[in-house]
From Swiss-Prot:
Compartmental location: Cell inner membrane
Protein source organism: Xanthomonas oryzae pv. oryzae (strain KACC10331 / KXO85)
Membrane topology of this protein: Peripheral membrane protein
Entry's family note: Belongs to the ABC transporter superfamily. CcmA exporter (TC 3.A.1.107) family.
Protein name: Cytochrome c biogenesis ATP-binding export protein CcmA
GO BP term (any one): cytochrome complex assembly
Gene Ontology CC: one annotated term: plasma membrane
EC number(s) from the headed UniProt entry: 7.6.2.5
Annotated InterPro entries: AAA+_ATPase, ABC_transporter-like_ATP-bd, ABC_transporter-like_CS, ABC_transptr_haem_export_CcmA, P-loop_NTPase
Main subcellular location: membrane
Ranges of residues in domain ABC transporter: 12-214
GO terms, molecular function: ABC-type heme transporter activity; ATP binding; ATP hydrolysis activity
Subunit annotation: The complex is composed of two ATP-binding proteins (CcmA) and two transmembrane proteins (CcmB).
Amino acid sequence: MIEPLHTAPPLLAAHALAFSRNEEPVFGPLDFHVDAGEALLVQGDNGAGKTTLLRVLAGLLHVEHGQIQIDGKTAKRGDRSRFMAYLGHLPGLKADLSTLENLHFLCGLHGRRAKQMPGSALAIVGLAGYEDALVRQLSAGQRKRLALARLWLSPAPLWLLDEPYANLDLDGITLVNRMISAHLRGGGAALVTTHGAYAAPPVRTRMLTLEAAA
């Protein structure tokens, strides 16, 4: 007798997910999933709820309606934060620490074992030679690159990237796409929000379009 094939559950799945603010709907209900090795590009105009969606998934906002599953199991808020790496509009860096000190501090803060040494991560994002530079001395684009280095050090399988192309030049945009592609090849997944035309999605990319609530 031939045994039936067992397909792995999605890395992340959302069922009837919805969010409201002051009784006004922000998004949803939404049903979507992301498999290992896949990126989901979340598009929509400003006010469509892209940032809010990522914050809900990351556990920064409470799930009001619907369900979030990780590997086929309902995920509690704390479980999601350990499973996901979130890159938001603000880099969340310590302005009076150096770039290298920031990476060491953040790795220790989250109790995570870095998958590469912080110095190597700086080189990957084009900040080699800036190890001792204070964050407050960096440009907006350099701060974004430092935030990308922190992301690269995270062992989290799912990346939540909110407008990762903002404040980056063409080289920076190419860097983001390369990082996403490498993460997917390693078995990770990514949700990427954008409302511009900068994104050149890597392989195995699907689209989710959000519309602003009427």
